[in-house]
Regions:
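Intrinsic disorder/low-complexity segments
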Residues: 1, 14, 22-23
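Bacterial N-terminal signal peptides that target proteins for export
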Residues: 1-9
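Bacterial N-terminal signal peptides
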Residues: 8-18
Length: 156
């Protein structure tokens, strides 16, 4: 009887530990999927900015999107799109590097990258490396860009 009881307990523990392990691996896979999606959206964002693709920007940006530019200017979705359409805007060179997902959950992803920017945009003359933080959120089942911040990297 004791032996049967011991085998039942052992069996339950094995099943329970397997279930816990499966739950953890699925969470890790989900985080990796979010990270991949956010990294792809980062490239979509930069390509749309470079190509002045305002339709993609309007599709990507959440309605309450906000971006903080160097010098502290804050722009919303409408202002950001207007800056991209601006005929005074010089051809902007954008070269992202070191894209890292810093936080990923089922509904939020935070990325940083180092983007070399050259050109004029929104009255700011860019000529060098910028540290960028981008925030993506899942709204109604779809990933959207919620915000960003850009800070020049000081020459070392």
């Amino acid at each position: 009887m004791k032996r049967t009881y011991g085998l039942v307990v052992l069996f339950v523990l094995v099943i329970a530990s397997g279930a816990v392990a499966l739950g953890q691996s699925s969470k890790k896979v989900a985080e990796e999927d979010v990270a991949k999606t956010a990294a792809i959206l980062d490239h979509v964002w930069l390509d749309a900015a470079h190509n002045r693709d305002t339709e993609t920007m309007a599709w990507l940006f959440a309605d309450n999107f906000v971006e903080v530019h160097p010098g502290g200017a804050i722009v919303d979705k409408k202002e950001q799109i207007a800056q991209i359409e601006d005929p005074q805007r010089a051809n902007l060179e954008l070269h992202p590097d070191d894209i890292q997902v810093r936080y990923a959950s089922p509904d939020v992803a935070v990325l940083t990258d180092v983007t070399t920017i050259r050109g004029l945009s929104g009255g700011v003359n860019y000529n060098g490396k910028q540290r960028v933080i981008r925030v993506f959120v899942k709204q109604n089942g779809r990933w959207r860009a919620a915000g960003a911040g850009i800070v020049p990297i000081a020459a070392q």
